[in-house]
């Protein structure tokens, strides 16, 4: 009788291990799989079976277009006018392996890269040209970011400059607000 319960418990544990290692990858996602700590495979949408204790899901990556809205960056134009510019980056993961292992914090890396690129582009322009050339700025930033993020498995679809606000205008608005209080 005891043997029966032991066998029943073993069968139950075996079934539990097998069922817990059946993985369904949803549409528009991929899973990066590591076997014994090193990259093994990238699973696409569908049913997969993971080898217990040998394989693990290292990262679940969305293939949908993602939006990263970055805070305003202080930049200086060629004619030494300081302004605040905030950007929105639309990107998509194209290679889950590179995205997982290419850079430690991809969103933070994109933010730093976009801020540096924005400073370089705006630094070559004068204030008037900056205010009227939003499409040119968007195109240049998109091209530079897309090329730089290729090695991370990321495609930058577009970059939008949301606001271009000269700092003198910001100070004027702050003084108006204080005066109204």
Q: Where do the model's predicted regions map?
A:
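Single-pass alpha-helical transmembrane signal-anchor segments
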Residues: 2-22
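Amphipathic, interface-forming alpha-helical segments with heptad-repeat character
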Residues: 25, 33-42, 48-167
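General alpha-helical segment detector with a strong preference for membrane-spanning helices
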Residues: 99, 179-180
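Conserved small/polar residues in nucleotide/adenosyl-binding loops
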Residues: 170-179
